[in-house]
Curated annotation (Swiss-Prot):
Keywords: Calcium, Calcium transport, Disulfide bond, Glycoprotein, Hormone, Ion transport, Secreted, Signal, Transport. One of its GO terms (molecular function) is hormone activity. Glycans are attached at N62. Its main location: secreted. It is found in: Secreted. It holds the Pfam family Stanniocalcin. Residues 1-18 form the signal peptide. The keyword Cell division does not apply. GO terms for biological process: calcium ion homeostasis; calcium ion transport; intracellular calcium ion homeostasis; response to calcium ion; response to peptide hormone. Produced and secreted by the corpuscles of Stannius. It comes from Oncorhynchus mykiss (Rainbow trout). This is Stanniocalcin. Residues 204-241 are annotated as: Disordered. The gene is stc.
Length: 256
């Protein structure tokens, strides 16, 4: 999906949490400190969950497989559903049902390996968004989709990244809508980021690393930033850039 844009730097920022696969066996001791639901617990929960509402996605929370995130996205869609038009309301209901049914139907095939299970959820999510025309919904509901795409609270989330990537794979008009919404919330820093992402293409066979920058670009601090990869929402450094949860009002005050 990202090939359409040639977004080299997306692995530096947008994709760090979404595309970084930690080895399940290596990561399990660290996760055990804040996770309680084993894969079998998750499977049993999904098997008994209703396909409406956010119950299915609640089963994915607090899992040793680090599958948090879809429940927050589900709640965001439900909380903003009233601001969508008729097409948007249908999309909210059907996309959440589609993802819930897809995940539940494939859970027993993938639950044994955390990496496979995580990817399956993302693939189902992406397929449902595409099938139900998320691009058309975003074009006709720019304000509502902007409320859903709240970057500061959801950056370290692989399923938020799948949502954002699905929107960025749309036509230029829709991408412009999403971009404008993000820039309005995050200010000039996000504008600079988008310029880097959309102007720098990744040539095939390139040996450039994720910290490479376009010709002529100078990093503000003299060297590329180093981002700490934190796969889970829990146990994060509260002072970390992507861990800060700031409201829209706080952002607006900072931008004044």
């Amino acid at each position: 999906m990202l090939a359409k844009f040639g977004l080299c730097a997306v692995f530096l920022v947008l994709g760090t949490a979404a595309t970084f696969d930690t080895d399940p066996e290596e990561a399990s001791p660290r996760r055990a400190r804040f996770s309680s639901n084993s894969p079998s617990d998750v499977a049993r929960c999904l098997n008994g969950a209703l396909a409406v509402g956010c119950g299915t996605f609640a089963c994915l929370e607090n899992s040793t497989c680090d599958t948090d995130g879809m429940h927050d996205i589900c709640q965001l869609f439900f909380h903003t559903a009233a601001t969508f038009n008729t097409q948007g309301k249908t999309f909210v209901k059907e996309s959440l049902r589609c993802i819930a049914n897809g995940v539940t139907s494939k859970v027993f095939q993938t639950i044994r390996r955390c990496g496979v299970f995580q990817r399956m959820i993302s693939e189902v999510q992406e397929e449902c968004y595409s099938r139900l025309d998320i691009c058309g919904v975003a074009r006709s509901n720019p304000e509502a989709i902007g409320e859903v795409v709240q970057v500061p609270a959801h950056f370290p989330n692989r399923y938020y990244s799948t949502l954002l990537q699905s929107l960025l794979a749309c036509d230029e008009e829709t991408v412009a809508v999403v971009r404008a919404g993000l820039v309005a919330r995050l200010g000039p820093d996000m504008e600079t980021l988008f310029q880097l992402l959309q102007n720098k293409h990744c040539p095939q066979g390139s040996n450039q690393g994720p910290n490479s920058a376009p010709a002529g670009w100078r990093w503000p601090m003299g060297s590329p930033p180093s981002f700490k990869i934190q796969p889970s929402m829990r146990g994060r450094d509260p002072t970390h850039l992507f861990a800060r949860k700031r409201s829209v009002e706080a952002l607006e005050r900072e931008m004044e």
